Amino acid sequence: SQLRWINLLLIPFSFLFLSCDLGKVELDNCQDLGNYTVDLPGIGFCPELSTGSVNDNIELSISVLDITDAAGVHAQVNYDASMVKIISADPGDFFLRSQKPIFVYEDDGQGKLDIYVFFMSSEKTNSGTGQIADIIVKLLQPGSSEVSITTESEILDPKDVKIPIKGFGTGTINAE
């Protein structure tokens, strides 16, 4: 009888303790608006703070935040060309549907990166929060530098009418 009580209590509690995984909390979930310091609707960086070593390549994502009926985005990014070099830019998943979105980027190598992404399918708009681009940058020298979304950035509806943007995000890149 006593053994039965031990089995009834010990086995379930063993599973409870063994199944609890207290792993790291993911603080850079790009879908969580709480991870951004940008007014909404807006465009921001995920993560807003990145750290790496000189000569490392690190990834930054550009996300649209709490937008409605977007058919396309032009995101202009200012960066310190003495501190980071743009290696590549690829489309995020926000405009990914049955067809891949049109995605073009232009880096002047002097500190300005323009990203254009828009629908070319029957699924004309998307709303919400999501990544529009994933950028790989190389850290050139030690120190801290800022990346920022400029006010030249635009979000457009299917008729090419600008959707108002309230927040233009900034990010910090630290190279050690």
Q: What annotation goes with each model-predicted range?
A:
Residues S1-L3:
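N-terminal secretory signal peptides that target proteins for export/translocation
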Residues C20-E176:
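Acidic, low-complexity intrinsically disordered segments
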